[in-house]
Amino acid sequence: MPTIKQLIRNTRQPIKNVTKSPALRGCPQRRGTCTRVTITPKKPNSALRKVARVRLTSGFEITAYIPGIGHNSQEHSVVLVRGGRVKDLPGVRYHIVRGTLDAVGVKDRQQGRSKYGVKKPK
């Protein structure tokens, strides 16, 4: 516990909350253009993860994960990006929203459809 003299000398610093998705600039989602697709995960795991390098409208160049099985994203695809990290891919702090703009929904998906941009089957 500091003394009154110490508190006069230097005041208490407020806790600053740092954003986990700075490239979105406080917006829920951002639009961007893909510049390249796929990378590999960190140590105990190995595979080609579906990841796209995206240049956002905010000017940031980020790495975003493409969720779901199969995708049609390629270079120059316009995509919508939301926050949310991927645990085994360092530096991947964003997800691409499926079913909007150029990113199509997951084919033949029955459950959890809203997360993968799939309409209700007839």
Curated annotation (Swiss-Prot):
Gene Ontology molecular function, alphabetical: rRNA binding; structural constituent of ribosome
Subcellular location: Plastid, Chloroplast
Keyword set, alphabetical order: Chloroplast, Plastid, Ribonucleoprotein, Ribosomal protein, RNA-binding, rRNA-binding
InterPro entries per UniProt: NA-bd_OB-fold (IPR012340), Ribosomal_uS12 (IPR006032), Ribosomal_uS12_bac (IPR005679)
Subunit details: Part of the 30S ribosomal subunit.
Function: With S4 and S5 plays an important role in translational accuracy. Located at the interface of the 30S and 50S subunits.
Pfam families membership: Ribosom_S12_S23
GO cellular component terms, semicolon-separated: chloroplast; small ribosomal subunit
This protein's name: Small ribosomal subunit protein uS12c
BP GO terms, sorted: translation
Lineage summary: Eukaryota, Viridiplantae, Streptophyta, Embryophyta, Tracheophyta
Family listed: Belongs to the universal ribosomal protein uS12 family.
